């Protein structure tokens, strides 16, 4: 097979008009215009309003390429477009070769008849989706009125990432373009059409069944060879006879063959003493390479497809128990407590989503002790690279299909389109070790059940929902992947409008803290089986705000700051919660900092509670991990990759072992959650300290917490400190057998009432090979101490930490964690460093 890449330099123009500029493909209208200096940064100030209007026009991308004579001799020449956004007409040498209408699909067109020897032209016209929506004609009684928060009317009529039309955390950047690879494939031989890999686990062995479908002429003369390797060394292979589908599996050192005349060809290989794949925190992530080769009658390799798999069983357990039915990921027979967050598209301009960006975000998840990420259904299906990284890092993927918070008009054309979309993406992703479940949609069953603005829609649209998500979608998923657990919606109790928000079954989304302005303590009233969404907003750091504002804009109620806040009344909510917990900050920068502390406290409150009730609750996925532009939002990592306080706190509250405290009347209970596969012996010390960090009371204890157990380890009556509650804080310190020390701090009154002194913090920096170590001392209790840097972006080993005694505290910065700038030496780090404190 010959491959001609068409990435690189293209020309961008308004359709039918002169050239505007060059654009690098993968690229888009916005990336091209901004890169050429034709428009300002789309994210700066209120430029969103300007860029939105650009997409009332049609645009075209064009370039030339050379097709050599030997290419034209091939029987098939296929144009492969892995990402066209969205309504596109493709022309080769002025002749229309085909059209596309779904950014979630790969489009393949046979273009041989349009090519000639020498220079050829390809032109792709992207039609305005806004004009398409305006011209859309509904059937009688099926006009859709519902619009998602922050979105645009009609967004659900197009198979385009819904959040590109705006969301309550994202702008209306309705971009268009070629956002993934585009290339030609020329060949005359049969091709591998599909590879499906399934596993059967039995006594210390795994049977790997590889099903290979082949298309083209002379298939009966071809052979298929499958080789399974780990670390580049073959561990097994298997051959079946030309007419056999099953034989006894055996281990051998070379890949062996089966006739492709059995189409599909089925090969079963057996791996004894397999190395099992585990989620992060439960074991290693060994991967096996499955290489599938198509050979002609002479043994020449015609095509090779390689997929990486992990050997594991992975499903959702829904066993009945005394509370209802559990909802827990079960990996290799072990029920795990899912800890993670919701992942949205990494950028509004999709061609800027690089493997490096994905790797950084997922590494940040792993470093914060995540074992699960939910790919949310209002965005897009990430690249193969994303799932490869999740496989490597042990991050279970809760995979939504791309339907979210919407009402759909189910026409015949729409049904055909989404069925192909689902089939293609399920086949593409089904082999990944990290794939935990398929979910039909986000919040749509719940919306039809009790959202008034959705319930008021036509009964015919409700019928469309039932047909789509009870029949069409699950049928398409199961036809392509019968192995992976399917869940109709999130939240849900299993579909069919059977009380989708039932706390005792399925998964739940909980938003009374935040949208309902309930206090953090409200989390303790709920015992969800699996909380797949809950969240709290914060502002990004000052450096991020400076990227999209002028100095005059730096007030949270300015026009620009409100433009970069897409949730109505959210800034007021932040101030409300701030007033409940903290004194009003003295300046704008401090306000941003305190908002992040609030966010971290809220999420910690919920996660600590649910981890204390492991067994009843078996998962927490907070909303949300990342941003797609610089904005005030629920994210724990901002658009530029800067960790907020929440992400540093998550590293602790999602730790394999985590200590927490909660009040029960006059008793302060200290809990230790252990999610590891080993029992944990501990020593616990409980302190009452004053603002000078002097110990007023100390209690100790020892014990062991079992495997995957959460238990109270110390109970302290604190009623005797009522008269001193404004002058003290409480600290629990747990030392594990391996020497790790875990700490938690609580107060008896909100921080706003504490008589905090202004801390004097000294900092000395030492360079130690590949790292810097920051040595800190504080003159008094300094909660939520934060270290920032003027120029470089860094990820510290710890941040937003409590300084609870006069002893030296050390914070490590690995040099590899310095980004977007440089730190030359210890003196330079000292000069760039800024320390923020609550008092």
Regions found by a protein language model. Give the residues of each.
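Active-site neighborhood of glycoside hydrolase catalytic domains
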Residues: 392, 409-496, 640
